Amino acid sequence: MSEDSEKEDYSDRTISDEDESDEDNFMKFVNEDIHQCALLTADSISDPFFPRTTQILLEYQLGRWVPRLRKPRDLYGVSSSGPLSPTRWPYHCEVIDEKIEHIDWTPSNPEPMYIPTGLEVEPLYANSKEETVVYLAEDAYKEPCFVYSRVGGNRTPLKQPVDNCDDTLMFEARFESGNLQKVVKVGEYEYQLTVRPDLFTNKHTQWYYFQVTNTQAGIVYRFTITNFTKPASLYNRGMRPLFYSEKEASAHNIGWQRIGDQIKYYRNNQGQDRHHHFSLTWTFQFPHSKDTCYFAHCYPYTYTNLQEYLSGINNDPVRSKFCKIRVLCHTIARNMVYILTITTPLKNSESRKRKAVILTARVHPGETNSSWIMKGFLDYILGNSSDAKLLRDTFVFKVVPMLNPDGVIVGNYRCSLAGRDLNRNYTSLLKESFPSVWYTRNMIRRLMEKREVILYCDLHGHSKKENIFMYGCDGSDRCKALYLQQRIFPLMLSKNCPDKFSFSSCKFNIQKSKEGTGRVVMWKMGIRNSFTMEATFCGSTLGNKRGTHFNTKDLESMGYHFCDSLLDYCDPDRTKYYQCLKELDEMEKHINLEKVIDDSDTSLKEITLDLETSSHASDSSESNDSQTDLLKLNSQIKTKKKQLKTKKERNSTIERHQNIREEEQEVCDKGHLVQRHKESDSDVTDTRPSISDDCIFDYFRRQLPNQGFFKILGLKFYCGYTHMISQTVIQKLSRDQQRCVLGTDKKNQETVQPRNNDLYGNCIKVTSLKCPLNKQTPIWTEKTRIPTEDLHHNLKSNMKECPSFQSKKADINWTDDEKRIYRDKNIAQTQEILQYLLPIMRSTKNVQTTQIKEVFNPRTSFQIQHQQKPSSNINIRKCSTSWTPPRNLPLISQRTLIVSTSKWLQPLDWKSSESSLPLGGPKKRRKYSRVKATKTKDMKAASSKWEMTPSSSEKDADKSLQAEGSSQQGTMQTAPHPTKTKGEQPKKKHGQPAFHLKLQRDT
């Protein structure tokens, strides 16, 4: 095969590698010399050597005919020899002849967001025939689908609903990108507006852009748009409408600005078919009388604006050398979709080694902020800076600045003239229905055959969240290297633009509904870094721009930051790359820890399964993860898929539980009641610890030790399934019955021994629990749990017996009775476990890893003993140890506890240990959910934004590694006797302060 046949042949009219490296092979536009010469086509002469075609032009120069190839007119779309390609509209659309133009202006000061006062009015309008219709556009549903298009749209005379009155505002939206369906005057200075849905659909009412004339200065007008469909909007979070005044632009050079008072977004009463609509209302005073003004949802950027911008590039002799403009395809309305190829031209084969970067924008026509980001990118990449030149020398940029020009022209918000969302049809084979996305996918596929594509980014706008962020792709295999690598570029972007880009808002999952998006399709085609950049319609909540709106310069600056981050990502010096990789690894540890802390209904089995499927489960090492043994054990467990129960089985379960409750009620009626404490029902609820929920270990989900049973009047009663009763009922029993029920005639001590092989069992031994009755010392029967030899079987049985309600609910269709039974069982277990006085351990930031391993090691038997005393106070001294925060801490719960009025559990030295929490205390836990490019206390003074020093947590981790090497078989020290620590001051152990816990029970 010849070399020419190997050249890239784009049937979709994209540029080839030959076009990238050499001068344009087609003839230049006809200059003055050729204009004076005769031009003939090859079929107009009878020369047998020339084929009969109209594509060859013959120029008579210097006494001879010179053949030239005719260049297709629409290959470029924009040129210096003629006017721009006219826009084509659906034939039924009315279009005014006036050309709408706005100046490009940026306010000197950031525009603040609106702060609601709570006094905003919510106007509700009823349909009335007496109201005056001020504006009514042509019916959007005149045709059920797109038929054909023409330049200028409908050529019939335009209709004007009312004449130019003295005090009535005049509205107009029949221009490019305009959107307004109907305006009704409901008051002297109050107007009800309705925006038009996307053509050939009945939804997507979000974008508005209209003109207002015949204004009067100094009068408060109210505008209310009544047919929005989204329940949530940024207007309720401080966003203001945009306003433009032609008199302000001509007199003071002021362009688009944020305005409005009494802004309110609310649900109205105009719902149809049970679908509620939402209204946006605001008040405003026009600055000038008899002015022509505009209101818009976001800064408009029309198809004509793009053509003028591309025409300027084509007319520039410098930029046109490395920026080739072609027509990718035509839309169904025959409007052109442009594609730009930006790279430094080379005449050798070195250009084939360049990697490619692909950018697209405006697939949703109402997201105009994406066009402003694209404009900022093109301004920078086509500039004269050294970084821009380096980017052009390194990469080949393929840019599609406007994927949906038809929707932009008619003023749609989301769809094309096919009535479909193009960003859900990248997998479609219907080239005629979705030409722009079909040709884009085809162009990228052919490009990937020639060169590597390192990044794909589709620019969008977001209507519900602030800041700028990205959506990425994360595969189901969750390989750790790829899992973190896909997050490096967004993290670099957040470092380069910390006041606009939010890394914490980025998401990297693939939903089934998003499988047709460009991001997911390109990722499945093999582009590893495939992103969707979302820019808010509102503003920022970060840094110096917090609480302010984004303007056009802010959006354009994101194009520069994108290029800057691309250079950092591909820098031969991989320092920044590996630094971000290390930070992402640390972030994952904290995020997983927060996920366990925040999920109060997560059972031990769910945490284990989450660890198995996480990116760190296969790569965690024993030196940096305190739960390595847990992961090793659980990695061998094969979970079984739970089968759904039939209706008959569920009914039998309900009947069985009802019988159990009836038997228990019968026992209570006979007086055979069991009371483990002397307090009444109200006192029992007050015996819960009065400390922070973040400090409670998840002992409440563990299985209780075997309690045996008491024999009362010939009946068996299991203590593990009892109900607390009041003191008055106990007093009704005889003294012998009370002793028998409360176990005071038994031995004076009960010991709960740990099961050495039970990973989820209680790893403690509790002695001398005081339960006085009539000033007598209670005697408890000692019962010891027998360790189970089969650890694997015991681990599976424990996890199977104590799943959370949330996990059960996902697999079984629970009835109300089953839910109530399940909750009652959990409450009973919680009440029973409180009586064993389980130790409460604060999560400290600097606890050593080796010691915390021993806390959770089932083979380490440590005891917390309590000396039996007649007094009501039990003092426990608990020594805190130093440890590194584990990746996933499975024993922390956020269960809400009722604080005891007597505060029977009080930490004596709370402040000394508060600073050692891994999340900075209960109020600072959310810190790790947001990534900020700011210097922390643990960082040394860095010369740049990328120079960092190891944090304190990393230093503590190194210390813990050294400690682990020196003491591999170390065990946890037994806590000192409580009587010896009374009145002592907190001491330090291993460099960390110890704290005391004081327990007091009411007698």
Swiss-Prot record:
**Keyword line:** Carboxypeptidase, Cytoplasm, Hydrolase, Metal-binding, Metalloprotease, Protease, Zinc
Q: According to its UniProt record, which reaction does this protein catalyse?
A: (L-glutamyl)(n+1)-gamma-L-glutamyl-L-glutamyl-[protein] + H2O = (L-glutamyl)(n)-gamma-L-glutamyl-L-glutamyl-[protein] + L-glutamate
Q: How is the cofactor bound?
A: Binds 1 zinc ion per subunit.
The EC number on file is 3.4.17.-
Q: Which cofactor does it need?
A: Zn(2+)
Tell me the compartments it is located in.
Cytoplasm, Cytosol
Q: Which GO terms describe its molecular function?
A: metallocarboxypeptidase activity; tubulin binding; zinc ion binding
According to the UniProt record, where is the region Disordered? 1-23, 642-662, 911-1003
Q: Which residues form the active site?
A: E534
Q: Which residues are recorded as binding Zn(2+)?
A: H364, E367, H460
What biological process terms from GO does the record include? protein side chain deglutamylation; proteolysis
User: Domain of life, per the record?
Assistant: Eukaryota
Q: Where is the composition biased (Basic and acidic residues)?
A: 649-662
Q: Where is the composition biased (Polar residues)?
A: 963-976
Q: Where is the Peptidase M14 domain?
A: 299-570
Q: Where is the composition biased (Basic residues)?
A: 922-934
Cellular component GO terms held in the UniProt record: centriole; cytoplasm; cytosol; microtubule cytoskeleton
Protease as a keyword of this entry, yes or no, is yes
The similarity comment for this entry is:
Belongs to the peptidase M14 family.
Q: What does this protein do?
A: Metallocarboxypeptidase that mediates deglutamylation of tubulin and non-tubulin target proteins. Catalyzes the removal of polyglutamate side chains present on the gamma-carboxyl group of glutamate residues within the C-terminal tail of tubulin protein. Specifically cleaves tubulin long-side-chains, while it is not able to remove the branching point glutamate. Also catalyzes the removal of polyglutamate residues from the carboxy-terminus of non-tubulin proteins such as MYLK. May catalyze the hydrolysis of aspartate from the carboxy-terminus of target proteins.
**Protein name, as recorded:** Cytosolic carboxypeptidase 3
Species name: Bos taurus (Bovine)
Phylogenetic lineage: Eukaryota, Metazoa, Chordata, Craniata, Vertebrata
Gene field: AGBL3
